[in-house]
């Protein structure tokens, strides 16, 4: 009897110790995932509403009278229409993103001739609708092209997009978004230039096509110095919010900010008015 009681007591002790060890172990976050789905088919393997249950997802493109074009697209979740995209496009990409915390998002893009994006961003299911929460497109300062490259880490997303900048020509930029306050928010108004195709291949510099005013910060309006025509300019990074955009530059030993060029200021598609030999081509 004593041996039986001892074994029972030992078993209880081991069980309690196991519970204690388990309770202090850190909870391992799930690995974030990204899946590509195709329009015209019903998908039943993914949660898009955020309730942890698999949903029925279908994206239906609207036919156009023109070959190779679509008049828009409708998104259905569990047989209910939850989103209408009213843009004409030729090709469409759909990606489902699930963060480490289980929160799902859609990355949608529609493209036309020359890979120009007409809609491109992150979408989230809210109150029975799928709505855009991040817009990758800013047509004020450039023509957006190609599909974004997305890098996942926990509840953070790094997004690299390509555009034909009216200041700098073909470039790749990067922003970081983090899950906060129930959605994905950009972590900073400062973005990175990953690639600048029009920069001098040997020096990495741009040549000023005219005198350009530089400012001390992107918000103060305080003048710093003037970049002289034909001098070399190194592009560092950029700042943007709303419809404002400034580019951080280095000219000799001086660093400052210049206003980015808009489409109207670019004189159509003639080339950048700020820098020499910058054409709006791939």
Predicted features and spans:
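Bacterial N-terminal signal peptides that target proteins for export
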Residues: 2-13
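Short aromatic loop motif centered on NTY/YTY
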Residues: 91-124, 129-204
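SH3-family beta-barrel domains
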Residues: 183-216, 262-282
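SH3/SH3-like beta-barrel superfamily modules
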Residues: 226-278
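Sec-dependent signal peptide cleavage junction
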Residues: 21-33
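Acidic carboxylate motifs that coordinate Ca2+ or other divalent cations, activating on Asp/Glu
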Residues: 51
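A short beta-strand motif characteristic of beta-propeller blades
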Residues: 33-34, 81-87, 134
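Bacterial N-terminal signal peptides
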Residues: 12-23
């Amino acid at each position: 009897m004593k041996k039986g009681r001892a074994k029972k007591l030992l078993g209880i002790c081991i069980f309690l110790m196991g519970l204690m060890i388990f309770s202090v172990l850190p909870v391992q976050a799930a690995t974030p995932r990204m899946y590509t789905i195709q329009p015209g088919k019903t998908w039943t393997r993914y949660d898009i509403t955020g309730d942890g249950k698999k949903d029925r997802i279908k994206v239906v493109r609207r036919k156009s009278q023109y070959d190779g074009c679509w008049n828009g697209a409708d998104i259905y979740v569990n047989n209910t229409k939850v989103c209408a995209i009213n843009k004409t496009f030729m090709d469409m990409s759909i990606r489902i993103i699930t963060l480490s915390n289980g929160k799902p998002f859609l990355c949608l893009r529609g493209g036309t001739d020359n890979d120009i994006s007409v809609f491109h961003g992150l979408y989230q299911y809210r109150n029975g609708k799928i709505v855009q929460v991040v817009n990758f497109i800013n047509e004020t300062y450039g023509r957006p092209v190609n599909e974004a490259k997305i890098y996942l880490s926990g509840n953070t997303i790094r997004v690299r997009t390509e555009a034909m900048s009216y200041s700098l020509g073909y470039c790749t930029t990067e922003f970081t978004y983090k899950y906060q306050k129930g959605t994905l928010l950009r972590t900073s108004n400062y973005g990175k230039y990953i690639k600048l195709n029009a920069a001098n291949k040997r020096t990495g510099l741009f040549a000023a096509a005219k005198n350009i005013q530089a400012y001390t910060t992107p918000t103060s309006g305080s003048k710093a110095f003037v970049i002289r025509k034909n001098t070399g300019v190194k592009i560092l990074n950029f700042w943007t919010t709303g419809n404002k955009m400034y580019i951080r530059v280095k000219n000799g030993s001086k660093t400052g900010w210049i206003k980015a060029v808009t489409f109207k200021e670019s004189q159509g598609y003639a080339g950048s008015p700020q820098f020499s030999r910058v054409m709006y081509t791939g």
